[in-house]
Amino acid sequence: MLEHIMSMIIPVILILLVLAILAANIRVVPQSRAFVIERLGAFQGVWGVGLHFKIPFIERIAKNISLKEQVVDFPPQPVITKDNVTMQIDTVIYFQITDPKLYTYGVENPMSAIENLTATTLRNIIGDLELDQSLTSRDHINGQMRAILDEATDNWGIKVNRVELKNIMPPRDIQESMEKQMRACLLYTSDAADDL
């Protein structure tokens, strides 16, 4: 009798173990996400929204990627204008992952690569402008940066939707002289209005 019970327990345990392994490998990919799948270490495919089954011990989810637009605020970068004025510029990048495979395998650290590319692109663009131009040409700089970054990040599976210069900070002495000039203009304008 004991042998009969033992002979029944082992198959039941094995069946439960197999069912547990199978259940643990069923995956649901939610909306706005993609899973990059590797089989035995090689790229197998990209799973989109829905129910999927991962082959146990052979396949693995290499990366779980958000397909939503993402916003990255980079710290202020020191840049030098054409007239040799050093200032700090704070940038914000709005981007979206368009190709999960390229995003996973195209570059080692995508965020670091975007940050470095943003800094060098900003330095190149501002380096061609004088201080006055850089302070008054935000839309032009934003558009130029977006076009350059979008083209460069295509190989990484990334689309740059927008670039914004959040803050342009000239050196303290130049900022003070600009404020004095603005006050003088306002004073002159109010004096001229009083004379009328």
Please tell me what each predicted stretch does.
Residues 1-182:
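N-terminal hydrophobic membrane-entry segments
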